[in-house]
C-alpha cells in the first residue's frame, strides 16, 4: 500500500469549468505544453460549472491516477461557497493548485490575475485618453473575477470624480442575459 501511495504517475489532472471559453482553452494549452516539456502527462476534465461533476472528478482521479490537480473552480461551487471537496482531497495528500477562479478558504497554491487592478488600470487608461462615458459589460457578475473587475472599474470612476452612469453598466450572470440587455 505504501508503495502505491508514494508512486509517481507523472500525470497532472486539470479541471476547467468551460472549454468554450477561449481563456480556459489557452490556459490548458499552456499547461499541456509545459507539462510535456517536463515529462508529465495531462488529463483534462471539464466541470461544466457543476459542483457535483467537479467533486466526482476530483474523487475519481485522486485514487492514484494523478500526482496533483490544477483547477479553476466551478460557478456552482463559487455560488454556494462550497469548497469542502477541495479540502478533502488536499487532506488526503493530493496537492491542488487553483488558477483564475479560486477559493480563499482553501489552503493551496493559487495563480491569479489581479482582476481589480487590471480593471482599475484599464479604466484609468481610457480616462487618460479623454474618454468620458466608459461602459462596463459583464456576463460573469456572479463570479469572484467579475465582481473584482466591476469594483476596479467603479473605483477608477470614483478616483477621477466621474459619476456612475448605470445606463451604460450591464452586469449579468450569463452571456444570454447580457445579449438580451444589449
Regions found by a protein language model. Name each.
Residues 18, 75, 140:
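Flexible, active-site-proximal loop/turn residues at the rims of small-molecule/cofactor binding pockets
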Residues 13, 43, 110:
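Short aromatic/hydrophobic contact patches that present stacked aromatics
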Residues 47, 74, 100-103:
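Histidine-centered beta-alpha loop that forms part of the nucleotide-sugar donor binding/catalytic region
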Residues 67-69:
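Short, Asp-centered acidic motifs that coordinate Mg2+ and/or phosphate
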Residues 1-29, 37-38, 48-49, 60-63:
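N-terminal helix-turn-helix/winged-helix DNA-binding helices
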Residues 33-40, 60-65, 80-182:
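Bacterial carbohydrate/catabolite-sensing allosteric modules
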Residues 52-56:
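Conserved ATP-dependent adenylate/AMP-binding module captured primarily in the ANL superfamily
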Amino acid at each position: 500500500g505504501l508503495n502505491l501511495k508514494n508512486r509517481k504517475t507523472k500525470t497532472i489532472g486539470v479541471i476547467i469549468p468551460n472549454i468554450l471559453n477561449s481563456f480556459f482553452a489557452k490556459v490548458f494549452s499552456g499547461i499541456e505544453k509545459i507539462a510535456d516539456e517536463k515529462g508529465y502527462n495531462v488529463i483534462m476534465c471539464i466541470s461544466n460549472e457543476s459542483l457535483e461533476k467537479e467533486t466526482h472528478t476530483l474523487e475519481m482521479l485522486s485514487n492514484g491516477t494523478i500526482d496533483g490537480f490544477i483547477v479553476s473552480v466551478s460557478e456552482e461551487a463559487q455560488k454556494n461557497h462550497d469548497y469542502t471537496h477541495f479540502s478533502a482531497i488536499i487532506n488526503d495528500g493530493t496537492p491542488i493548485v487553483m488558477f483564475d477562479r479560486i477559493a480563499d478558504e482553501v489552503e493551496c497554491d493559487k495563480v491569479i490575475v489581479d482582476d481589480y487592478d487590471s480593471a482599475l488600470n484599464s479604466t484609468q487608461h481610457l480616462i487618460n485618453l479623454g474618454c468620458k462615458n466608459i461602459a462596463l459589460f459583464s456576463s460573469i457578475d456572479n463570479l469572484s473575477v467579475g465582481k473584482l473587475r466591476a469594483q476596479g472599474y467603479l473605483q477608477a470612476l470614483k478616483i477621477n470624480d466621474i459619476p456612475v452612469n448605470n445606463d451604460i453598466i450591464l452586469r449579468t450572470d450569463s452571456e444570454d442575459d447580457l445579449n438580451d440587455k444589449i
